[in-house]
């Protein structure tokens, strides 16, 4: 991936978010590349051109991954296949391969399952990369640390001249915030999730989830 300035990286991220949200596609020419992120809350597919310019994206809410582990292989495969087919229809382009991101520090068995999911969706896997490392590439980082707070886990990767020298992943994320809110207020999970995302409730929510946030900070501090 070509190096980007911080401003260019942030613009690309904002544009990709808009493409995912609206379903729009950019004009393109030449070869396109597909990336798959199997997350705890969502499965996201991204498409870029040869210059790493965002062209399209898609997502689906999913519960097939839990704390970085695939718990529903068939559901994960179906979701990846459906996302790919939707992008192909919108772009008029056929994908035969994809790269995928995995939680940092996972064992070989988990990595193999992620690989099998992509390949079962009729895609050749070109690369399997740690999620924080994928983020570092987008940001053009070669040295430093990336902290990835997901729905199910908090991951930390440390890079030295582009090489990963440390990678950890611990089961504390947005999902755990929601559980704490649900228990504190005596409400269901879905209602707690909506409360967590409501900007008007930010002050109320922050006090309740503070211990979870501190746990995430401890994970990062211990890794670093």
Predicted regions, residues:
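Nucleotide/phosphate-binding catalytic cleft detector across ATP-hydrolyzing
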Residues: 1-40, 44-149, 161-170, 174-224
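A structural feature that tracks compact, well-ordered secondary-structure segments
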Residues: 155-157
